[in-house]
Amino acid sequence: MMRTPSRLRLSAVLVIALSSTALAGPADDLSRAAVAAMPALQLGAAAVGEARDDGSSAVLSNVTFSSTGDRPVGVKVNRITVTGGTTGSDALTNARIVIEGIEGTAADGQSYKTDRVEIAGAQGSLAAILGSLATREPFFQGASEASVTGFSAQNVTIPAMTLQRRREARMEQAVYRDIRLNGYQRGKVTEMTIAGIVTSPTEGQQGQRVEIGASRFLGLDTSAGVRTGTTTTVALDSGSLEQIRGTSAQNRPFTIDRISFGKVSMRPGERSLVALTQTLQDIDPAGASEESRRRSMGVVAELFSRLDIERVELAGFRGSSNEGLPVAVTRFAITGVSQGRITSIDFTGIDAAAANGQNTTIGRFSIETIDASGLIALAREFSDGSFSAGKPIPPTAYPDIRRILLENVDVKERSGQRLGKLDRFEIEGGPRVGIMPTRLRAKLTGFEAPITNASQRAQLAPLGLTENVNLGAELEIEYVEGAKELRMRTFNVEVDDVGSLNLVMAIGGLDRAQIEALPGSAAVLGLAAKAGGLTLTYAEDGGVASFISHVAKQAGMGEDDFKEQIKQQAGMMIGQFIQDRALAEQITEAFGEFLDDPTSLAITLTPKGDIPLAALAVALRGSPFAAMPMFNIEVKANE
C-alpha cells in the first residue's frame, strides 16, 4: 500500500524535530531552562545570544535580562561559563561558574559594572544566581527573596566592582575591591570580606570622599534585605570596618581606626529593607514640600521601628571642628537600639580644641535608657497626615532619658594652665508624668577651679581661698502624687574650706492631670501652684570665720568688735521687716550665737496658709522681706 503525501510530510517534520533535539547540548538545555525559570524569580526580558558547549563547560554569550517590579534593573552579561554540575535543567550540582563583563542599569541612573564574578561549588538554580545580578548592589541584595535563596555556593569572588548610586538625592561612585562571600547557603553567608571600598561624588557632584580598608561581616543574611512577611530575621551576627579615612561634609579630613557592629535584626513589615532605603534615597533632604517631608518621616520612622541593633561601636576617631581645630574620640558606642529605645549612647576619651585657645578632655560622656518611641509614633502620624506642623507636640513625643553621666572633665589653656576640672556629674530621672520626671537626682563631685588672676584672688580672699575652689553639689527632687507636691528633698552646694548650703522646699497644688498636659497647661499650673515649707541651712567649714577675720582686719577692728557691729546692724534690719518683736529678738539672738561660734545656721519658713506662687512672686517684686508676713519664721544656730 502506498503512503499518502500528508503522512510523508508529517514523518519529515518529526524526523527534523527529533534530530534537532538530539543535536541540542547541555548549554542549550541550561540556557532554555534558566530563561524559563526566570519569571518565577521576578525576572524577565531574558535573551541568550548564543549557547554552546566547550568541552565539559557550557558557555552562554550575550545574555540580557532584567528584574521586574516598579524599580527594574536591566543586566547585560558578555559571557557565562558553567563547568561541571549541569543536569539538563536549570539546577546545578557543585558547578564552577565564571561570569564576565557584567553591567547593571536602573531607570533612575543608578548602575554597576564588574569584569568578573567567580562562583565555586554552586548548587541550585542558575536563574537564581543571575537574579542576584538584577539589583543595584549584586550579591548584597537580590531581585527577590526567591532568587536570593534559590542557590548555594562554597564561595563567590568579585575581584572589583564599581557602583553609581544615589545618596541624599546626589549621585556617588563606590569602588569595591576583592569581595568574597564564603559559605553562601540560600542567602545566608558565613563570612563576607571586602579588601577595600572607596566612595566619592560623581563628576560634577558635591559630596564626601571616604576610603575604607578591610571589611568583614559574619552571619550575613542577604535575604533579610528583600524579605517581607511576619517573622523577625537576623540580618547580621557581627561585622567590622577597618582604617576609614575621608572628608566631612565641610571638607574636613578625618580618620577612624575601626567601626564594629553587633547583631542586627529586621522586624517584619509590608516593605522590605531594600525598598525602604531606595524610597529614602529618592527623597531630596533639602526638599521643601510637605509631601517630601512626610514621606521622609514615614520611612525613617519605619526603619527605626523595624531595625534592632545590638551594638555599633566606633574606635579611634580623629578629625577637626568647623574651625579646623583638632577633635579626637577614643570610643563611641550605641547599644540596644530597638523600636525607638536605646540602652546607651557612650563617648570615651574626647579631646577637643576650641577657638578661644582652650583644650577640653572628657573621660566619659554617657546617655542611658533612652525611650524615643513616642517620637517615632509622632513621625508616623506626621507621615500619614494625622498630625500637622501647626499642632502642639504631645508630651509622649518628648524622649524619656533616665541617666546622663559625665566623668573626668579637664579644661586647660594651650599653655597647659588648668582652668577647671570635674571628676563626675550624674543625672538620674524616674518615670515621667507627661514631660516631667517623677524623680530627679543630680550629683556633682570633684569640681576644681584654680584661682589664676588678681581679680579672682580679690573676690575669694575674704573666704580664705587663695589657690583653688573645690566644690560638690547634689540635687534631689520628687513629685508626690498623693500630696500633689513637688518636693526638693535637697539642693546642697559644698565648698571645701568654706562651708555648705542646703535648701529643702516644697511646692503644692500640682495636679497630675495638669502636669500631664504640659507644656500647654503651664499657665494653669502656675496659678494653681502653692508655696510650701522651706528650710535653708548653712554649715560652716571656715568660710564665715575667714570672712570675719579678713573684713575686720581691713576695717582696722578686732574680730569681737566687728562681730558686735554686725549684730547691731542685723538687729536693726530685722526689726524693720519683722513686726513681731519677740520673733525679731529670737532671730537676732540666733544670728548672734552663730557669729560668736560659726557652726551652722538654719532658717525655716512655713506658710501661714495657702500662698499661691503667683501672689508670692508679686510680693517679692518690691523686696525679699516683703513676703515675710506670709510665713512663720524659725531661725536656729549651731544645732
Model-identified regions with their sequence ranges:
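Glycine-rich, small/hydroxylated-residue low-complexity segments
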Residues: G25-E639
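Gram-negative bacterial Sec-dependent N-terminal signal peptides
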Residues: M1-A24, L605
